[in-house]
């Protein structure tokens, strides 16, 4: 396995670790509605950081974006909005199926759809089937899916042991939402594929290869921001128990505390895709679709490890932890299989 591929896998792991940890600061926010907290974090992660970093990278910010036609920018934006819809469905999936089943189904579907639809759309799927390296990477995707399933099973055992149930368990509604979440969340993978002309243009301007994908985040995350912020602001305006004014009428130290923690959560959320861009840059072009598989499977892996570190699995017994550990090992094996396949 080449150093470039190894570093690509490593950066995807770092990004996934940030994704697995980003919600920790949000949990310490006090006396704010989820909508206000999510909006503040989202403004940081979807608007302020993408725009600021792009302004630092590009020699002429406005000239860069104005150089693209609407036919180039619109698909990137719409796929970003598609991913934003997946974000909202994610929370509803947890509500009706519970954390473990919801995450397992949603992540499993988005892993498959986001990974395999890109080569199918680009007309390259036959290359994967007809080459040794392609078949090896497909095997890695399958093994990763098995690993996600094992970790999901561990989560179910944990919830059963701890007596945790879905807020409003509804299998039919939950499955529909999980499928929708999985499909729509893959919009980020599709957006990265559609943004290739933007990456090439950034490279032509002398932007370091590790950073060429970052300017496209202004458009991708702009689409996601409109969906997420629109959802939050509508709820803040219409739901009687929610009030943006009330959230910002708290004592000043508490407001500062909440803003800083929400901003930190937003920063950590953004860093997952900052390092995703680094990993994506190191993956061979013919296998760039594998970036999504690495990100999603590592997200599940890191989520399990973070849970162990935070002692969330204490008092659950040996079996859930053993199953979780097995799932994590399978995901690590999958990453190695994919790496070997790309090297071939």
From Swiss-Prot:
Reactions mediated catalytically: L-rhamnopyranose(in) + H(+)(in) = L-rhamnopyranose(out) + H(+)(out)
Principal subcellular localisation of the protein: membrane
GO MF: rhamnose transmembrane transporter activity; symporter activity
Highest taxon in the source lineage: Bacteria
A single cellular component GO annotation: plasma membrane
Keywords recorded for this protein, A-Z: Cell inner membrane, Cell membrane, Membrane, Sugar transport, Symport, Transmembrane, Transmembrane helix, Transport
Disulfide bonds, paired cysteine numbers: none
InterPro entries: L-rhamnose-proton_sym_RhaT
Location relative to the cell: Cell inner membrane
Transmembrane stretches, start-end: 4-24, 38-58, 68-88, 101-121, 137-157, 175-195, 214-234, 259-279, 290-310, 323-343
Key word ATP-binding present: no
Membrane topology: Multi-pass membrane protein
Family: Belongs to the L-rhamnose transporter (TC 2.A.7.6) family.
Protein purpose: Uptake of L-rhamnose across the cytoplasmic membrane with the concomitant transport of protons into the cell (symport system).
HAMAP family attached to this UniProt entry: RhaT
Protein name: L-rhamnose-proton symporter
Organism (species): Shigella sonnei (strain Ss046)
Phylogenetic placement of the source organism: Bacteria, Pseudomonadati, Pseudomonadota, Gammaproteobacteria, Enterobacterales
